[in-house]
Amino acid sequence: MLHLMNKIILKPGKDRSVFRYHPWIFSGAIAKTEGKLQEGDLVRVYSSDNQYLATGHYQIGSIAVRILTFEDEEIGYSFWLQRITAAYHMRRAIGLTDRADNDTFRLIHGEGDNLPGLVVDYYAGVAVVQFHSVGMYLERGNITRALLETLGDRLTAIYDKSESTLPYKAAIDPHNGYLYGKADHFVAQENGLKFNVDWLEGQKTGFFIDQRENRHLLEKYAGNKQVLNMFCYTGGFSFYAMRGGARSVHSVDVSTRAIELAKQNVALNFPGDRRHEAFAEEAFRFLEQSHNKYDLI
């Protein structure tokens, strides 16, 4: 049993979404609070007739509670270990782990894994973590420990990249850095294609892992097509299109660093292939000035 002074009581009728297992409580649904609630605190949620509903992290804003559990259970280390282990086992069951052609996958996807406010991407031994709520950030010690216990020797480093993802008004001062170990930039692999990962300076966790299936889908349609990859970042869609047999691929991004990485990634997979051109330009200016016709954009 979990005993907390912090308590939220909902308005009549506002518990319906909770009974449907919606993971958020909106501020407008709250009738009153009990206890000295601070952002990131664990809080118990009750219906208007004082029935226990859920426990979650309190935050200031329109989303007032991100629900962690609908059970009346302790939120301690064993809770975090169970959730993270379950997420890993599910990825293993669907074939994302232990593959010769793939060492990259999203290990934790927030609400999808009943861990709202937490994203963990795995790159060939490095877990890159982003906390999107103060409550999750305050649990980083337990989360680090649970990742290490779950992944064991598959894990060489854990990097926290939460400076830009936490609420800017929160009374904390997060800094990007390693929570465990250390690793240099290196080459990871997705569906047999290689790419440089820059979790220190790159966008998101270093690569848009959640677009894996869309990249693979593009590959199926790219044969003999002229392809334009706008806002290309490091070129993920570009080299999938090339493997799919595209006649030509143009990659456009305003970031010169992203374009450099896109060129490197294409060279890793298709050395000497002249079907690819990369442009460090503002996207809409490129479109205005380009006279090319494209089959896929």
Segments from the language model and where they lie:
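Short, surface-exposed beta-strand-loop junctions and turns on beta-sheet-rich folds
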Residues: 60, 135-137, 203-204
